[in-house]
């Protein structure tokens, strides 16, 4: 007898698929692809694995499902943080993903099919070339819960500039359209649907997989010039976030958000 799927929730995962020189890293979490520490760790490890694999020439970073790209930090884990050390460790997960992408010798193509919040915007910014659909609105919501986009900030600012980054940060409850994000440089292209987007992603990935790896590595190094201090900078930002997340303001704001959503 076929079992009912009512109430069934897929389990979280991070998986990597390798095919014809292209590594596709896909992550999923049933809560709108939110990012608990173990997912962040696995994404960083997967990027490193693809980087070390000589058969891989280009990487695609995507999330599962067809609605949200990434809801950012897991609120459940934020609420469970008891001290500064735990806070620093959690936020270091975002630093590790961004730094893994930054130091990866291979181009990373981002695939953003839906809304991106906080760390999801940071992850998109850490890719080298990002595709999106028209449903991929973005928001940096950190200030609304009493912290700030400290860890992802350098990656976002590098991609869209200080003015647009300031606009996103200070309007922490506002969604900005995919078209706005394209105009600011976060997204290279915005498509009507995932079918059109995936066709173009595959075309670019195949072209890059047949390009000179040495030339691509040199180009990537040039593109990321000026970020050599990010190992230290992002960990410093993680410490700052780890302190702020312990405040009563943040605890109350997260509780209020969870009750209303």
Label each region the model flagged.
Residues 5-26, 169, 174-208, 216-228, ...:
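Amphipathic alpha-helical segments at domain termini/boundaries
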Residues 25, 43, 61, 74, ...:
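Terminal peptide-recognition signature
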Residues 100-118, 123-211:
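Crotonase-fold acyl-CoA enzyme core
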Residues 40, 75, 153, 162-166, ...:
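A general structural signal for well-ordered alpha-helical segments in protein cores
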Residues 222, 236-240, 244, 256:
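Intrinsically disordered, low-complexity segments enriched in small/flexible residues
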Residues 46, 93-105:
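Catalytic-core regions built around general acid/base machinery
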Residues 2-62, 99:
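Conserved CoA-thioester-binding segment of acyl-CoA-metabolizing enzymes
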């Amino acid at each position: 007898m076929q079992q009912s799927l009512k109430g069934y929730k897929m389990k979280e995962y991070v998986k990597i698929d390798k095919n014809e020189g292209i590594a596709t890293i896909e992550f999923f979490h049933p809560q709108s692809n939110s990012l608990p520490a173990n997912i962040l760790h696995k994404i960083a490890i997967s990027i490193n694995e693809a980087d070390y694999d000589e058969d891989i020439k280009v990487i695609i970073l995507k999330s599962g499902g067809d609605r949200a790209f990434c809801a950012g930090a897991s609120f459940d884990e934020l609420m469970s943080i008891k001290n500064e050390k735990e806070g620093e460790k959690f936020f270091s997960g975002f630093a590790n993903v961004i730094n893994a992408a930054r130091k990866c010798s291979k181009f990373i193509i981002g695939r953003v099919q839906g809304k991106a919040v906080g760390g999801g915007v940071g992850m998109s910014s850490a890719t080298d070339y990002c595709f999106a659909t028209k449903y991929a609105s973005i928001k940096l919501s950190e200030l609304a819960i009493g912290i700030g986009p400290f860890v992802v900030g350098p990656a976002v600012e590098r991609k869209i500039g200080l003015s647009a980054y300031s606009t996103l940060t200070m309007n922490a409850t506002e969604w900005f359209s995919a078209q706005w994000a394209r105009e600011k440089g976060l997204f290279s292209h915005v498509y009507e649907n995932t079918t059109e987007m995936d066709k173009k992603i595959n075309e670019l990935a195949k072209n890059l997989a047949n390009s000179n790896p040495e030339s691509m590595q040199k180009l990537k190094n040039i593109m990321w010039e000026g970020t050599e201090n990010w190992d230290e900078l992002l960990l410093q930002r993680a410490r700052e976030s780890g302190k702020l997340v312990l405040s009563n303001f943040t605890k109350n704001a997260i509780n209020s958000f969870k009750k209303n959503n």
